[in-house]
Amino acid sequence: MSGRPRTTSFAESCKPVQQPSAFGSMKVSRDKDGSKVTTVVATPGQGPDRPQEVSYTDTKVIGNGSFGVVYQAKLCDSGELVAIKKVLQDKRFKNRELQIMRKLDHCNIVRLRYFFYSSGEKKDEVYLNLVLDYVPETVYRVARHYSRAKQTLPVIYVKLYMYQLFRSLAYIHSFGICHRDIKPQNLLLDPDTAVLKLCDFGSAKQLVRGEPNVSYICSRYYRAPELIFGATDYTSSIDVWSAGCVLAELLLGQPIFPGDSGVDQLVEIIKVLGTPTREQIREMNPNYTEFKFPQIKAHPWTKVFRPRTPPEAIALCSRLLEYTPTARLTPLEACAHSFFDELRDPNVKLPNGRDTPALFNFTTQELSSNPPLATILIPPHARIQAAASPPANATAASDTNAGDRGQTNNAASASASNST
């Protein structure tokens, strides 16, 4: 979690809203096996507001925190597992997480299937329940497994996980949405298919230039230096810094900047990047330009990592963990980095022999920040496949574990027509 209590009341430009209109009763019954079945009136996550009855069973708690509780459940109609995130709804405000999740539709972002409201134990207490894709693992748990075994995560997995993370960031940033809590715990994984899905949009916000934002955001080890400096006019490049911290952690087997406080965090960053120049400090937060820092030289990146770390991985890390926010790569530029060239090889497979997940089904929306990058991001074999088959919706749920055959979308088709 980001270290601050989270309800659905926000100080950052949230507008009052009336009582939820889709508030419905929760009915409990038993199926033929005697299992408890809960039926609610829920609204689909995407599309028009058409509430419908949804029944689920086999409910159990799988997570909790300051945000609320997460349950696992099984949908009765399909037998699919889902995660239900239950958060306290402040009736004075719209729930920003819900508003954002209803906009998103991408193969590397956890999907909002339904949402519904339920009453709490106290009078007038209302909870918002988000019914999400259930994904069994996290990057955090997988990385911890390797670390405890005194092993490093195989580089092919580092490439797959980071590439998909950057795709998800390119997508949300194209809408002006900043996640603000990128960390290994919020990166869900299917261990069989290697599909990664970004989750937990409880801290996410659509950033508007000129509007202030809270600086106490993001979990400590992954906080960009401008946040530590108290900046309130930051950009979505704080997500890129966090992603750089995740990449470094996967390569090292431990967090790269493990500070116990904000000041300690800054010390850890300075140990690696050296003391920021006055100009770099001005770029992060102009109010700090007169602050005196001890003069420390940057540590060579090659000495930060193990000797066998791929040079391309180190080069990518150095382009993400930059003091100056505008000097950091964009997520789309990161996807095009040479570190990920192996993923663009038509013969690449997962270590278990399976095809890689969908990697090249870019939408025009995803490519909007830099359309010319499509020539790098969509390799020739994917362009040929796109030209030979009708384009499909890049964000269809079935894309997530079916490879890229026949699934590259209009952006790929356009690229194919221009370059084949």
UniProtKB/Swiss-Prot annotation:
Residues 1-22 have a biased composition (Polar residues). Its main location: cytoplasm. It comes from the Eukaryota. CDD domains: STKc_GSK3. GO terms for cellular component: beta-catenin destruction complex; cytoplasm; cytosol; dendritic shaft; glutamatergic synapse; growth cone; meiotic spindle; membrane. Phosphorylated by AKT1 and ILK1. Upon insulin-mediated signaling, the activated PKB/AKT1 protein kinase phosphorylates and deactivates GSK3B, resulting in the dephosphorylation and activation of GYS1. Activated by phosphorylation at Tyr-216. Phosphorylation of Ser-9 in the hippocampus peaks at CT0, whereas in the liver it peaks at CT12. Inactivated by phosphorylation at Ser-9. Phosphorylated in a circadian manner in the hippocampus. The keyword Membrane applies. The modification Phosphoserine is found at residues 9, 389. Changing residue 9 to A: Loss of phosphorylation; No inhibition of activity and constitutively active. Its EC number is 2.7.11.26, 2.7.11.1. Expressed in the liver (at protein level). Residues 56-340 form the Protein kinase domain. It catalyses: L-seryl-[tau protein] + ATP = O-phospho-L-seryl-[tau protein] + ADP + H(+); L-threonyl-[tau protein] + ATP = O-phospho-L-threonyl-[tau protein] + ADP + H(+); L-seryl-[protein] + ATP = O-phospho-L-seryl-[protein] + ADP + H(+); L-threonyl-[protein] + ATP = O-phospho-L-threonyl-[protein] + ADP + H(+). Disruption phenotype: Embryonic lethality at 16 dpc due to hepatocyte apoptosis. Keywords: ADP-ribosylation, ATP-binding, Biological rhythms, Carbohydrate metabolism, Cell membrane, Cytoplasm, Developmental protein, Differentiation, Glycogen metabolism, Kinase, Lipoprotein, Membrane, Neurogenesis, Nucleotide-binding, Nucleus, Palmitate, Phosphoprotein, Serine/threonine-protein kinase, Signal transduction inhibitor, Transferase, Wnt signaling pathway. The active site is at residue 181. Monomer. Interacts with DAB2IP (via C2 domain); the interaction stimulates GSK3B kinase activation. Interacts (via C2 domain) with PPP2CA. Interacts with CABYR, MMP2, MUC1, NIN and PRUNE1. Interacts with AXIN1; the interaction mediates hyperphosphorylation of CTNNB1 leading to its ubiquitination and destruction. Interacts with and phosphorylates SNAI1. Interacts with DNM1L (via a C-terminal domain). Interacts with ARRB2. Interacts with DISC1. Found in a complex composed of MACF1, APC, AXIN1, CTNNB1 and GSK3B. Interacts with SGK3. Interacts with the CLOCK-BMAL1 heterodimer. Belongs to the protein kinase superfamily. CMGC Ser/Thr protein kinase family. GSK-3 subfamily. This is Glycogen synthase kinase-3 beta. It comes from Mus musculus.
